[in-house]
Amino acid sequence: ISPQFAQYYVNHIFPLWVESYGRVTGLFPFSVGEMMLYLGVVLAAVWILWGILEGVVYGVSYVRRRVKGTKHEQSKGKGVKQPQTGSSVPGWNRSLCRAYRKYSLFLIWVVGIVCLIMTLNCFLLYQVPTITDRKLFITQEAEEHTYGAAELTKLRDEVVEKANALALKMERDEKGYIVSDLDIEETARQEMMSLGEMYPQLSGYYPKPKRLKTSAFFSQQYIMGYYFPFSMEANYNTMIYITNQPATLCHELSHLKGFILEDEANFIGYLACVGSEEELFQYSAYLSVIA
């Protein structure tokens, strides 16, 4: 697929899925994409177990026909002949086989639809030119300037200093953990919308990020957030520390605007958080750079 076509798709077609389908899935208080994963596991498990049952039933029927045919030939004193099939197969087994074939055909269609959705909402986005090639989020002055090691060192020190200063302003409990009553999900959504006012590529509708019910599983995979192409949702791991949540949520929301590369999403998440008036979001932005 040509980068030009991919870019056209992201600019003119991909936003339609978020504006329509994303609004529908956004009405649900839970992650629709996560429920789809559960359903997929159940459908696959049923197909496997059903197939095993079919194999066992066929094997038992085959053995019984062989034994019956052997006894019949022995009773006539003749040589062993090929046992007859067809009518000896139970009717319920034939019905079960037909149902299994229909179910398998249904799953083939499901897999085909899944592949189509993954192509349109994920794989195709990887063909889009990078933000560097498109010269997004960069001023002409910065583009013409060459940065050396001294300037990068100064930037590093500035990030660390700002993170340390913000750390002192965070509200903490008796154990020293940072606490906040801020609605991080809605704030992340608002910050991305504000960023969209500055950069047209990020403008438009943003659904509210969803919490993952199986956060423990995602923690084992070292996953802080997940973009579900099947439901156009931004999801996040509720077990991550509170200072990681703002940058993670903005990161996942950026995927809904066609920025599928992780480093680009990290950068956009940083921009959204560092420009926020909420100190927790600013702190999360600087920590995401340090990490």
Which stretches of residues belong to each language-model region?
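Membrane-interfacial, low-structure loops and terminal tails that flank and connect transmembrane helices
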Residues: E54-Y100
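Auxiliary, metal-adjacent structural segments of Zn-dependent hydrolase domains
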Residues: L168-T238, I242
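Post-HExxH zinc-binding segment in Zn-dependent metallohydrolases
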Residues: I260-A291
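Active-site recognition of the HExxH zinc-binding catalytic motif
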Residues: P29, A247-F259, D263-N266, Y270
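Membrane-embedded alpha-helical segments of integral membrane proteins
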Residues: I1-Y62
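Internal/C-terminal transmembrane anchor helices
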Residues: A99-Y126
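Membrane-interface segments at or immediately adjacent to transmembrane helices
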Residues: F123-M193
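Perimembrane helix-loop junctions in membrane proteins
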Residues: G51-R65, G69, C122-L136
